[in-house]
Each structure stands twice: as structure tokens, then as C-alpha cells.
């Protein structure tokens, strides 16, 4: 089974988590992204899928600006939102991850392709 869909542009790891009393908590920006991402999953009727198989994920990052960025700074917020939105059980199921820089897009987005790995 293969899923192709688009999710909102996430905050970077650095702006998503904050240190508080010697532990890390989700920032206001991170909490808002989680709400927006789960709403998008519901809109796409992908919430509650609870995929339990091993997965291959391909991401195309289409940023909102031309600012330079590291491709590995945006996966965490997205993957956590997919877990909380119950698209999959946990992001540890991802055995293969391919991340590609796309083109500047108004508002930014991430194009996602998720494939179930056949064992």
C-alpha cells in the first residue's frame, strides 16, 4: 500500500522544543503545528490509520522562503504529528527515509510518500 499526501511546513527542531526545569517540552509553535497537522490528517481522512507495518518514507521539502536550511531539521515535528494523529503507531517503524529539497512554495509544505515494506 502507498500513501501520497501533503502536510503543512513544520517548525524546525530548534524552535519546536524548549528546555524547562531540566527537561524538554513542546513549544507553543510545536503544539500549534501538531494541532494543524492532525487537522490536515483528518481532512485527508488519514487519521486513525494506525499503520503497524515497516515503512519507507520519501519527503520533498518545499520551504516557504529561500532561506538555507538543513534537511534533517524538519522530520521530527512531522513524524511526531503523524504519530499523534494516529497515521502510524510510532516513527520507529520507518526503515527507509529519503529527504529531498524541493522548491519555494507559498506557506511551505512537505510532500510525503509512505510505502508499506513487504517482508
Regions found by a protein language model. Name each.
Residues 1-119:
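Acidic, proline/glycine-enriched N-terminal capping motif
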